[in-house]
Amino acid sequence: RGSSQMKKLPGLSKTLFPIVFGCDNQSDANHAFAMFDHYTSLGGNVFDTAYIYNDGMSDQYLGRWINARNNREEIVVLGKGAHSPDCFPSAIRPQLEETLNRLQSNYLDIYCLHRDNLDVPVSEFIDSLNDLREEGLIKVFGASNWSLDRFKEANEYAHSTNQQPFTLISNNFSLARMIEPVWPGCISCSEEDFKSYLEANQIAIFPWSSQARGFFLDQQE
């Protein structure tokens, strides 16, 4: 892969391929291994998984492949947890530890809260994530499907307490506007005020469904 393609994320020493492999929906280990091998043969090195994906098999397939290829230090793993209805600070650690066990790894490069819970103060999420970072279980962290107001509030709290803030967001981001959430609790960051904030603060976007689930395809395609 050409070095000009690779991206940097503050807090990570590894460089990142600009196209991330989403690990959900792998039918079996053989299919997953073939897909992972093909992706890495093209220069890819970033894998997106989550505690709830495929009832945990997403983590397990990726972990088996990493173990077989002995390439943990060559790839970047983005894991997500605390999805509704378990979106509480108390759920983060046990789910993360189970994910790490499935992955046969002792850390995640990137961790994202999979959803937000408006009944929980942002301070509690930030404090919990910083504890895990200080223990070395995660390198950097961010949020998935968070509103602009809550994301800003969380980072303002982190800065005010000299803690690590969110360094990335994983919301929907596409040229197509999401009229209705694809899944409950999904949020876009394609709006102008959201984009302006992310650009001004140099927050990385790890978007999902940028191609709007085939919206831009010609019918014949």
State where each predicted segment sits.
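Active-site mouth loops of central-metabolism enzymes
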Residues: G22-N30, G81-S90, H114-D119
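Conserved, mostly hydrophobic/aromatic
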Residues: F21, F47, L62, V77, ...
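Beta/alpha (TIM)-barrel catalytic core signal, keyed to glycine-rich beta->alpha loops juxtaposed to Asp/Glu
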Residues: V120-E221
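N-terminal binding-site loop/beta-alpha segment at the start of enzyme catalytic domains
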Residues: R1-V76, E134
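A short, structured active-site edge motif that brings together acidic residues
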Residues: E73-S84, L168-F173
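A structural motif
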Residues: G44, S105-L108, I138, I203
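Active-site gating/metal-coordination segments in enzymes
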Residues: C87-H114, V120, S170-N172, M178-P181
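Short, acidic/polar
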Residues: S27-Y39, C87-L103, K152-E156
